[in-house]
Each structure stands twice: as structure tokens, then as C-alpha cells.
Amino acid sequence: MKFFLATLFASAVSSIAVDRLIPGAQIIPESDTRALLRVGGHHDKYHDRRTITIRPSRNDTDDVSRDFLWGIKHANHGGRLLLKKGEKYVIGRKLDLTFLDDIEVQLDGELKFTDDVSYWQENNFYYDFQKSITFWRWGGKDIKIFGTGLLNGNGQRWYNEFAGQEILDPDNEYYRPILFLTENATRISVEGITQLNSPCWTNFFIQSKDVSFDDVYIHAFSTNKSALPKNSDGFDSLNVDGLTVTNTRVDVGDDCFSPKPNTTNIFVQNLLCNNTHGVSMGSIGQYPGVMDIIEHAYIENVTLLNGQNGARLKAWAGQDVGYGRINNITYKNIRIENTDAPVVLDQCYFDIEAAECAQYPSQVNVTNILFENISGTSSGKNGKVVADLVCSPNAVCSDIQLKNINLTSPAGSPPEIICEGVQGDIGVECQASAD
């Protein structure tokens, strides 16, 4: 009798599990190593988990966002969603993934968003900070995304239609989605994947803790020379404690790495930035009456090629802006080549006339900054100037040190370092701005 009841119960459980499946999906138990091997879900590096697969898209308009959400829910609490190598998964509907707890997503295929501009501009997650929107948002705790696959923002149409516009124009209403966004996430890691052609920022982390990226390639390019990617930053953050980026390449045409207000405990190592606006702290101090901070950052072994800026600190000035501090930042072992402004403190951000900046200077203090072992060449665009550190008269700039700086300019020698308004000895000879 007991055997009969046990068999009946097992049969019922099996039936329930099968009934829960959607067409094309599969649930593989953690113990079924052979089945995991067949689908590419067994790894030496990671422990086996209950693994979920879903059907791929048949073409670029076959939206599997409902299947994807089903897979995420069934992989939650200790499982893994596997997106298979050689397959494409098209997402055409916004997704709220802020309920996650102990989940892995193995991205070996391509996860691609539709370029239905009218849909996405009406259906998205909106954030007041710089009028940001996103296709989806990830949140919860203990979230791992890894693999060799592609997260594709399908940005070309967005680039074409945004050409000639500016994200920070108060009249701008052409909002473009961020490719990957976390909100209220704790311990989220991304490893090994490629992120391609985000319509706007590539990554934005909000109100999150312990975010890490390792061995990721971020690329944004356009097939239309008159409509290049804009604002396709590699990394942005807001109210984040613990942000780590290692062994990563970024080629996007805008900021390579640019934590924004209230980001603390930052670690960057072995980062390659090509065709970017540099590794920036900020911008901060944008919003009236609001205090922003960026604090405790260690940036080392970074290569910056063919860019607008190298190592940059940036803060807003103007009539209606905020205040704050950039504190305890180290840039060490930085190689810079063919870059307009290799080292720069910009306290007249954003796109502000010199007269207005002088009338309404930045109120962001810049303290305890170390630039050490900085080498390479500027592009010569700014003449012989290779470092420009001009502090706002309404801010405190102190304990700023330059050590072992070996930067040259094709415009001639000796290279020039500008410093103005900085308290104390900065460690190298410098001169006042000619402006």
C-alpha cells in the first residue's frame, strides 16, 4: 500500500512538472549530468544546477519574451536558465525581473531586443535621472549572468533617428533604452558575454550593492557615418556601493566607465577603452540642491586609446545645480595614446559657456586624488597640454598628487600641465591656465 501511494504521489508530481512546461521548454534536474552535457549546461567552473531551456526565436520578429520570463521564474531560487549557443532569443516586450533570488543565466546564444521604437518609447521603465528608460530591469540578490553569448541592443535604428539630438537637451523627448539595468540588486555578476549596440547607455546600476563585471566586451558601432552611437557609455551607476569591473574591453564612442552620484567602493582593473570619453568620476552635482558623492575608487592597469579624455573628474556648474564631493580616487598604471585630454578635472560640465561657469562655479569638492604612473601621448588637440586641473573657486581641491607622469604631445615639448585653484603641491611643475 505504501509503495502504491508513493508511486501515485511521484506520478502526480511528475505530471504537475510536465503540465508546467510550455512548448519548446525543458527542465533538466541537477543530477542529470548526461542531459546537461547534451545541452551545454555542464561546466567544470560552475556547479550543476536545475537547468531550464526555452524555445529560440524562429526569426527576428518572433518575440519570446513570455517564454523568457517563464524560464526566469522556473530557474529562480537555485536554478539556471540556459540560452543555447547558436540560437537567437528575441525580446519585444518590457520585462520586470526584480524578484530574483539565487539564479544563474547562462547566455551562450544571442539575446536581441526588437527595434520597435514606438513600442519601447511607450512601454519601458522610466527613471528621472537624465530621463533614462530601459527595456527591462533586474533586481533581487545573488544573480549571475555568464557565458560566451551576445546581448544585442539592436541600436542602429535608434542611432539613425537620434542623430543631431542631445540627451541632456531639456527639450529632448526621444528617449532611448538602456541595454542592461539593475535596481535594488545585491551581489550581481556578469561574466564572459558581449554587449552590442545599446541604443543609449550600455549598463546602468541603480540602488544596488556588490555589482561585478569580468571578461566582458562592450561595443557600439553604426553602419551610418552620419548617425553614430551617442551616450552609449560602458558603465554608469547611481546610489551603488561596491562596483567592480575587471578584464574588460569597451569601444563605444562615449564614456568607458563613469560612475554617477553616490557611487562608493569602486575597483577597476585591466580595462581597455578604445574610442571613448575616458574613465570618469562623474558627472555629479547636476540637480539643484542635491548633494552627490563619488568616493573610494581604485583604478589600475587601464589602457585608453584614441579617445576624447583619459582619466577625468567631472562636475556640473551653472545657475541651478547641486553640490558634493569626489574623494579618495586613485588612477594608477594608466597608459594613454592619441587622446585629446589625458588627465582632466572638468568643473564646467556640461557644455557650459566659460562666462556662465565663471558666474556660477561648481560646488563639488575634489580631494585625495592620486594620478600615478600615467604614460603615453595626447592627440595634440589641446596643444602641448597633457593634464588640465582647474579647480572651481567655489570648491575645495586639495591633496591632489601627480606621480611619475610621462605624457607627451605631438604638438611639441615640453608637455604642459595646467593647475589652478588646487591647494598645496601637486608633485609636478605646473602652470596657470592661459584662459
Swiss-Prot record:
PbH1 repeat coordinates: 208-239, 240-261, 262-283, 294-315, 326-347, 366-388
GO molecular function: galacturan 1,4-alpha-galacturonidase activity; polygalacturonase activity
EC number(s) per entry: 3.2.1.67
Membrane-crossing residue ranges in chain numbering: none
Active site per UniProt: D254, H277
Residues annotated as signal peptide: 1-15
Family annotation (InterPro entries): Glyco_hydro_28, Pectin_lyas_fold, Pectin_lyase_fold/virulence
UniProt GO BP: cell wall organization; pectin catabolic process
Pfam families: Glyco_hydro_28
Gene Ontology CC annotations of this record: extracellular region
UniProt cross-references to Gene3D superfamilies, sorted A to Z: Single-stranded right-handed beta-helix, Pectin lyase-like
Catalytic activity annotation: [(1->4)-alpha-D-galacturonosyl](n) + H2O = alpha-D-galacturonate + [(1->4)-alpha-D-galacturonosyl](n-1)
Glycan-modified residues: N59, N184, N224, N262, N274, N301, N328, N365, N373, N406
Disulfide bonds: C256-C273, C391-C397
Keywords for the protein's UniProt record, in alphabetical order: Cell wall biogenesis/degradation, Disulfide bond, Glycoprotein, Glycosidase, Hydrolase, Repeat, Secreted, Signal
Highest taxon of source: Eukaryota
Principal location class: secreted
Subcellular location: Secreted
Record family assignment: Belongs to the glycosyl hydrolase 28 family.
Biological role: Specific in hydrolyzing the terminal glycosidic bond of polygalacturonic acid and oligogalacturonates.
Protein's recorded name: Probable exopolygalacturonase B
